[in-house]
Structure formats: structure tokens, C-alpha cells
A protein has these predicted regions:
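Extreme N-terminal leader/targeting regions
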Residues: 2-37, 51
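A cross-taxonomic marker for long C-terminal extensions/tails that follow the last structured domain
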Residues: 6-16, 148-189
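Flexible, charged surface loops at secondary-structure boundaries
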Residues: 67-69, 100-103, 135
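Short, low-complexity, polar/charged sequence segments that are solvent-exposed and flexible
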Residues: 93-98, 127-131, 159-163
């Protein structure tokens, strides 16, 4: 599979309902994207300017939708998830997850189809994240992972902390509530 990174945009179909940079409760509130130039890279590959950097050198994200009343968020990722070299999970928890939990978000749906590879080391931070979410009746689930990424995550035991759900086909055609319901149904089955 050949990846043309700068052509991969975060999903924008729900922007009429939610824009993370306009959400005063979001860690990305007020962030300005360069609309005229590609200024972010993962390794030597430029990526679309709409992705948000949370401090990782190899992994970017976009918070597609957050509903504080129902306490959930949907986050899409692109790049290499590298806990081994960069401790991406610690940065993610400290800069994104903890502030969102403080705002009442306890259900995390992570879209992983653009995670190209995973390098893990330990499950401590994943266990912490699951504990924080489940204390409020929530969960953390990764959906639409590529098979090799799912296997890489299972190899270090992440599937014992977080849900590594299967494919949620054509989720982009539906409202965000559909994805939430699908993840809840999967968790209950």
C-alpha cells in the first residue's frame, strides 16, 4: 500500500456540527492551521495541514467530534504510533486525554485506519487510560486498525487494556452517534 501523506485529510464530514479549534473546552481551542502551505511532517513526508500535533514527532491526530453531554469523543490518527522511542501514549494522555477527562469525556473512540505502524513497550499508560475512563463508566476503543497494527498492539498486550474492535464499515456516512452506538454494542456483545 502506497501512502501519499499530504493527500490524507482528517474526516471533515461533521464540521457543520463540531470544529475542535472552536471548542473552548478542547485542548486545541484557538489553534490556527496554515491553509496555504504544508508545514507539518511525519519523517520526511508532508501531511495535510488540518491534522493537529499533540507533541509527537511521528503521530498526529484530529478530534473529529466531542459531545460533552454524552461524554464521548472521536479522534482520528495518522502516522506511526511509537511508544518505544517517543512515548506517544504518555504525551497523548498528558496533553489530550487528561484535559478531556477533566471536561467530562470518558468514552474515547479512536480511528486507526491511518496508523501505519505501532511500536510499543509496556501497557502501563494504556491501563491508566482505561482505569480513568472506566471510573466514569466509559471506555477506550480503537476501530478500523490495519491488521498488522492490531497484531503489533496485541503483541504487547494492549488488547487486555483497551478494546481493539474490528472494522466499522463506512462510518463516514453516518452521524457520530452511530459510531458511538456501534462501539457500545460491540462492547456489550
Amino acid at each position: 500500500k502506497t501512502y501519499i501523506m499530504h493527500n490524507i485529510e482528517p474526516f471533515y464530514g461533521w464540521r457543520d456540527r463540531y470544529i475542535v479549534e472552536e471548542d473552548e473546552r478542547s485542548p486545541f481551542f484557538g489553534h490556527q492551521h496554515n491553509q496555504f502551505a504544508y508545514d507539518q511532517k511525519i519523517y520526511n513526508y508532508y501531511v495535510h495541514p488540518q491534522w493537529n500535533n499533540f507533541g509527537s514527532n511521528t503521530l498526529l491526530l484530529k478530534c473529529l467530534y466531542t459531545d460533552y453531554e454524552l461524554g464521548y469523543t472521536i479522534i482520528e490518527f495518522i502516522g506511526e504510533w511509537n511508544d518505544f522511542l517517543h512515548n506517544d501514549i504518555e504525551m497523548l494522555i498528558r496533553s489530550i486525554v487528561n484535559p478531556m477527562i477533566a471536561q467530562g469525556v470518558f468514552r474515547f473512540i479512536l480511528i486507526g485506519e491511518n496508523i501505519l505502524t505501532f511500536h510499543g513497550e509496556a501497557t502501563d499508560y494504556y491501563e491508566e487510560w482505561q482505569d480513568l475512563a472506566s471510573e466514569s463508566g466509559g471506555f477506550v476503543t480503537l476501530v478500523n486498525l490495519q491488521d498488522h497494527v492490531r497484531n503489533e498492539m496485541k503483541d504487547i498486550g494492549i488488547h487486555q487494556c483497551l478494546r481493539l474492535d474490528g472494522q466499522v464499515l463506512d462510518w463516514r456516512k453516518y452521524p457520530p452517534e452511530f459510531l458511538l452506538r456501534a462501539c457500545i454494542q460491540e462492547a456489550l456483545s
